């Protein structure tokens, strides 16, 4: 299955020597989508030997420095790699993302030899579906933070079941375009008879659903957007002893993150966006323990810089 999730960074506020700022990249059928782009994101790409030229889209959650200061570097990197980039780069984010980037491009006289397409989200006005093709769609949800902040949902479409050649031959369906249309899930007319895909296809395979959620305070409706998702990467900035600080700063504790995914019956939960105060493994495992106590059957894990998750049937395997 051609679906990988790469953890480029897991920290909040500022990068540490062993923990870059929160950023996640999806590799899906030969193209990549980057979620957030803090300082040193391009270093993570280099370390993990991920091609920045395959990045088709960059989705920014909000305009705080730890989520956007690496964006200009990525744009410059793509421009300085010769004329190898042919496709435009789509950048999605809240109002202001275009002004932020274009101002920096102008001031630094960056020569970019490819097109940037901006899609600025007006929360509660922009349609939820941001992008869609035959394999997937990307949606946004409103989060609760000190400025406009967006969560992203990556939803793989259901796939038609296995093509039954014997049934196709028994129905005299010729090889070629007609079979292809049926395999893609479309009805066809053949000799005056309508043939539906279910006649020659096996059971439909459910697509995978992934969510990237940071930065946000707890709110009841959040779990409704991620019901039965296969994997949710969600911020877990603080331990429970700092729950009042989390509330004040509009962030989540690991325990609250687990409450959200438990309520949503999420299959796997990855904790991310850890406070810079947690420099020891002991601190991070205390975060993990608090989340696991809240949702014992939640398949909860700590996201780690350099981690790769590979899709395998209805779940993701940590490589």
Curated annotation (Swiss-Prot):
Zn(2+) 1 binds at residues 62, 64, 145, 215. The gene is rnz. Binds 2 Zn(2+) ions. The keyword NADP does not apply. The keyword Zinc applies. It comes from Borrelia duttonii (strain Ly). The active site is at residue 66. Its EC number is 3.1.26.11. Zinc phosphodiesterase, which displays some tRNA 3'-processing endonuclease activity. Probably involved in tRNA maturation, by removing a 3'-trailer from precursor tRNA. Keywords: Endonuclease, Hydrolase, Metal-binding, Nuclease, tRNA processing, Zinc. Homodimer. This is Ribonuclease Z. It is an enzyme of class 3 (hydrolase). GO terms for molecular function: 3'-tRNA processing endoribonuclease activity; zinc ion binding. Pfam families: Lactamase_B, Lactamase_B_2. Belongs to the RNase Z family. Gene3D superfamilies: Ribonuclease Z/Hydroxyacylglutathione hydrolase-like. Zn(2+) 2 binds at residues 66-67, 215, 273. It catalyses: Endonucleolytic cleavage of RNA, removing extra 3' nucleotides from tRNA precursor, generating 3' termini of tRNAs. A 3'-hydroxy group is left at the tRNA terminus and a 5'-phosphoryl group is left at the trailer molecule. SUPFAM superfamilies: Metallo-hydrolase/oxidoreductase. Its cofactor is Zn(2+).
